[in-house]
Every structure is written in C-alpha cells, then in structure tokens.
Amino acid sequence: MMAALYPSTDLSGASSSSLPSSPSSSSPNEVMALKDVREVKEENTLNEKLFLLACDKGDYYMVKKILEENSSGDLNINCVDVLGRNAVTITIENENLDILQLLLDYGCQSADALLVAIDSEVVGAVDILLNHRPKRSSRPTIVKLMERIQNPEYSTTMDVAPVILAAHRNNYEILTMLLKQDVSLPKPHAVGCECTLCSAKNKKDSLRHSRFRLDIYRCLASPALIMLTEEDPILRAFELSADLKELSLVEVEFRNDYEELARQCKMFAKDLLAQARNSRELEVILNHTSSDEPLDKRGLLEERMNLSRLKLAIKYNQKEFVSQSNCQQFLNTVWFGQMSGYRRKPTCKKIMTVLTVGIFWPVLSLCYLIAPKSQFGRIIHTPFMKFIIHGASYFTFLLLLNLYSLVYNEDKKNTMGPALERIDYLLILWIIGMIWSDIKRLWYEGLEDFLEESRNQLSFVMNSLYLATFALKVVAHNKFHDFADRKDWDAFHPTLVAEGLFAFANVLSYLRLFFMYTTSSILGPLQISMGQMLQDFGKFLGMFLLVLFSFTIGLTQLYDKGYTSKEQKDCVGIFCEQQSNDTFHSFIGTCFALFWYIFSLAHVAIFVTRFSYGEELQSFVGAVIVGTYNVVVVIVLTKLLVAMLHKSFQLIANHEDKEWKFARAKLWLSYFDDKCTLPPPFNIIPSPKTICYMISSLSKWICSHTSKGKVKRQNSLKEWRNLKQKRDENYQKVMCCLVHRYLTSMRQKMQSTDQATVENLNELRQDLSKFRNEIRDLLGFRTSKYAMFYPRN
C-alpha cells in the first residue's frame, strides 16, 4: 500500500524495489488506513479555485476580470474553500477593502461577514458592510441580518451578536458604528430568576443559558461600551463589578471569568479617575451624587464637600479606585484642611502639636462648643484635629478604667450590692457619649452600612457590655444589702456577673486601639493582616469543630460507663494533678481534654488508663482514638491553619499599599462629616449650633404654612434644582474630558507596544501585492489566469 502511494521512495528514503515482495512483509496489523469521515463538500471547479486564490492574494484586477467574465453564471461566487471561507471572508481577513467592495457590488453574500470583520477588528470592512446598499431588494439588510444573528435559533460560525462581539474586542470605533444602527441588547435577568423565560431557557439548554449570560456580561463590562452608552461610566463600573462579584459566588462553574470581568470594571474606573489633571476635576468627580442617592440640600446650597462618589466606592469595595494616587492626594488635602503645613513640619514639632492638642482637648472642645463658626472653631473642625481630639478623649476613658481598678475599695469586697463611686459616674458619662455617637452614625449611615464596619461592631458590643455591667450594679445595690464571703455567693450573683462583663469589656476597649493603627504606614498593614487572619480562622473553625465533636462523641461513649468515685474531689480530669479517665464522663469534660491536648496541656495517659486490669481492649481503643486525633488535628489541621494564615498574610503583603490606603480612607471618611465633631462626653451637651439648627428648622416649618413662606420655599427649591443641574452639567463636561483622555492614552499605549507581528507582515504582503498588480496593469501586462497556480521561480 505504501509502495503504491510512494512508488519512488518509502518513508525511510529507501527505494521501492528494495522492499521485499513477500506478502508477509506488509501485514495488515502493521499499517493503519486513514479515511476522512467528515462531510465531504463538493469540490470547487478550477475557476472557483482561481477566484478564491485571487481574493486571497489581493489581485483586484484578476478578481474583477473573473467576475466580469461570469456573465453566464457558471461561476459560483459564493463558493467556499476547504476551511469553509468564501470570497468575502477571505477578503476581510486579508483586509483587501477594495476587493470587498467589488464583491459586494457583484452580490457576494456571507452571513458571517460582519462578525468576521468585527472579530478581525477591520474597521474599514465593518464600515463598508454597514453602509452597503444591496442592489436587490430581496436581500436582507444589515439590520435584519443582525436581528437574525441575535436570534438564538440562528446558527453561524460565531454564535454571537455583532454588538456583543465588538464589545468583547473592546473596539471603540466599531461599537460607535454599530450603535448608529439602532441595535439592542437583551437585559440579563438576576441570578436565580424564576420567570417564565428564564425557566424555559434553563430547561431547554442550561449550558447555553449560562454561556449567554456570560457573553452578555462580557459585553456590558467592556470599557468602550460603558463609555459610549453610560452618562456616568464610573457609577456603572461600580454596579457592574458588584453584580459580577455576586455572580461569581453563584455561577461557580464560571467563577474565574466573572471575577476577571469584575477586576476589569474596577481597573477601568481607576484608569478613568487617573485621567484627572487638577483638583477641581477630582472635586467634581468625587463629590458627584447620582439620582438614586440621597441628596444633602443644605450641603449643596452651602457648597459643602460631601465626597458622595468616594463613599460609594468604599461601599462597593472599589479598592483600586480609592487607592489611586490622585484620589489619595485629594483625601490628604481634605484631611489636613487648614493644617496643611503640618505635613511639612519636622518630626519633633509634629509630636509637640499632637501632645499639645491631646492634653488640652477638653479646653478645645469647650471652645468649639461655644463658638463653632469662629476661626479657632474651623481649625478644630478639620478632620485631622477631630481625629486627635477623639483619640485623646478615648485615651482619657482608658485612663479612667485603669484608675477604677487602682482605687478599688478592699473594704467593699464582700459587699453584695456596693454603691456606685464617683469614677463610676464619670465612666457612665463617657459610655453615654460613645453610645450617642454610635446612634448618630447609625441614623445617618443606616443599619446595613453601620454593621459592615468591624469598628462599629466592636464598639456596639463594648458599649452593650458596659451598659449591662452598670445596670447589674444598680440592681445589686438596690436588691442586696448584706455582707458575706464571696465563696458563699450564688454563682450568678449580679455583682459577679457585672464584674465578669466589665472585665471582658475592658479587653475590648483596649483592642479598639487597633483601629488607630490604620493611620500608620508601618502598623496599618499588620492590623489589616490580623483582621484577614481572623476571618480565615473563622473558616477553619468550621472544620475543626466537626473533628472535635466527632472524637468527643467517641471518647464519651467509650469511657462513660457510669463509674463514679466515692470520694469527693475538688478537681476532675485534666484539672487534677493525677489525670484519669473520669474527665470523659461528660461531654464538656471530653471537649476540654481534647482541646487542651492540642497545646500539650493534657497527658496522653488519660486516654488509655484502664478502670481494671481486664479492660485491655478499652485501653487499646482509647490509644487508637487519641493517636488518630493526634494525626488529624495536631499534625494536619494545625499545619493547615498555619498555611491559611501565611497565605492571608502574603496576600495582604502583595497588595500592601492598596489595602492600607483603602482602610485608611475608610477611617478618614468617618471624620469628614460634621455629624460627630465633639468627642465624648462633650457630645451629649446640646451645642449652640444644634440649637440654632433646631430653631431654624422649626421656623422654616412654621413659615412654610404661610403665603410668604411657601413662595420662599419654592424659590429655595428652584435655587437648589439649578445648582443640582449646574453640578450635573459640570460633571458631564469633566467626564467627557476624562473619556477623551482615556481613549487617547489607550491608543498611545497600543502604538508604543506595537511590534512586528504576523498581522503586520501580512498587511505588508498585501500592500506589495496590490502595488505589483497595479504596476502590471499600468504597463499593459496581462497575467494568465492559470499562471497564478504555477508562478515562475
């Protein structure tokens, strides 16, 4: 068989005559017959092959000559090659636009022509296809063709709509052309939507339904499409990234794709903000309020800086946007305010400034309380000064906690209901002030946003414990007036419970200082890493508790045989110097033993000690269980925990600058508004500013019911609408500038990274071929049609 295919030589280069003629030398087991099992298309004629070859080589005059000679219609101008490409597709891939126009004029058709042009990003071909007017009215227009392609039942080589494909390629020019054709895009339904349409699509083909949703979101996440179709591209990028993050948690099969699209939206918002060139543009962008957000009318009339867009970025967890250099520089300017010279001072002067403000913070608070609108009051109102004053107030609270333990009266140790001391009342004032501050934040931020901050959660728990502590002290003082030794008290006596809650609240009070580390570039990343590690430890507990519960059940059933000691013991199990199996007589005791065994605080003997010399099997089973527990928990799970914590720390370390700047921005924003200017306990004193606001609001409400008041209110609303409209117009102007700069920078980046690729070489080859054919035509040379198959060497 091989000799018949290659009569001169075989595969090894030997002559065919040298092959043995014995039939046994060509056994059927030594060869494998190959056969094309795919659908065999009708082979093209010689003219059709010539036609496709001329289109491939870019020979305009040869293509035109073949089409002109096809008056009888013998040539099928829609023929395809072995790859399934027709003349239009080949011409688009080679970027021969003049031949493409010629083919369209002669009626060549291709359902995939527009998709091929978009996929190849040949802008000229897309323009020709969209603007081409066919001679025959029976042919479908481009709009109808796009509608056919968008139909799920229509099958093409690339099963995707043109606008979706253009968005996937992120080609701004092609998308501009397509959007002029009044195209539409199906709106993706929410994940888990149970409407009739989604249920039918999911039931018919769940894979196609999921892939279609992914293609739609790839289109919506295209920066080019966002810039073209959205008036507020930054807000749209925020919303899309949040939706894509939610989809990645539901559509776990396509998690990587959705997470990559979410990162793309975040980077687009960041790159768009990076195009701002001055502080005025940054102020317009970061203070813009969308129509869906609540508006601060008083702040708008007073031209107050609300940083609504920045707060929205933090809400959507846009770390790239917030940590962008322009945004951080603007935040620094707002943070220091009228104390901008503080950053340029020497370190010693910085320390002296902080210590001076920290020592005299009560005097400064009283000055602001009396004259908040004075020059001195405006300086105190700056976020940096508020941070120092609030910090000094909190350190004073911690100092009172230390004094509380130092001045504890030993004479009242056995008093079941001791009275409150002066220092107790001071602590209560501070606690009421901190609670009032949390209530104001809860009122303005809402419950959901308030609980998202771990700092607010810790503050809520801490204040609740302090409230419960002093409430129990009051109850104990009113109910108990006797003296008795503490060992004779009830285990849940109000005084004992109050002392326990107070001790735990003190621990949380000092741990709250961790959040002040966020302002430091050295301690801040460590504090963020610790928070991430605690989250990972919570995930680890889900696995550890299951293992602990499993071994606890086994050991309790093994040793809980109702054995009780006749002697009264002061200790049980691992708490005794001589540990024995009596610790496993209860579920809690077994949990204690297994838990402390991890830290080598429980001896292995308690797992294998026998109640009698005949219970060797029980001892052996106990040894096997503790050995298995030692392997699973002590060796495997603890090492897994170490690996998880190391991974969390490394993840934060790799993005240390971004994570720290984002956390610092969240802390700074809590001091930017004027809701909590004074620290505890001065914030519980009604200030003149608050009284003036209340009187002003009451007078406006009364005047609004009069004729003059209604006119004044309408004028105020009209002024407010004009200011809002003016701000929106300024925002659109700035956004147009940012979009234009973004496109320019992307074009320059593509040009700077443009190198000699296969496409560039192919384009050069086509240009040389066109030039050669034009020279031949000008000189009068005519190439034979069949000479194209056999060119001269």
UniProtKB/Swiss-Prot annotation:
It is found in: Cell membrane. May be operated by a phosphatidylinositol second messenger system activated by receptor tyrosine kinases or G-protein coupled receptors. Also activated by intracellular calcium store depletion. Inhibited by xanthine-based inhibitor Pico145. One of its GO terms (molecular function) is monoatomic cation channel activity. Disulfide bonds join C571-C576. The keyword Cell division does not apply. It is a multi-pass membrane protein. Zn(2+) binds at H189, C193, C195, C198. One of its GO terms (biological process) is regulation of cardiac conduction. Seems to be ubiquitous. Residues 346-379 dip into the membrane without crossing it. Residues 15-28 have a biased composition (Low complexity). Residues 1-345, 380-386, 440-455, 518-536, 645-793 are cytoplasmic. Changing K647N: Decreases permeability to calcium ions. Its main location: membrane. Heterotetramer with TRPC4 and/or TRPC5. Forms a heteromeric ion channel with TRPC4, with a 1:3 TRPC1:TRPC4 stoichiometry. Unlike other TRP channel proteins, does not form a homomeric channel. Interacts with TRPC4AP. Interacts with ITPR3. Interacts with MX1 and RNF24. Interacts with FKBP4. Interacts with PLSCR1. Interacts with PKD2L2. Forms a heterotetramer with PKD2 with a 2:2 stoichiometry; has distinct channel properties separate from PKD2 or TRPC1 homomers alone. Belongs to the transient receptor (TC 1.A.4) family. STrpC subfamily. TRPC1 sub-subfamily. This is Short transient receptor potential channel 1. It comes from Homo sapiens (Human).
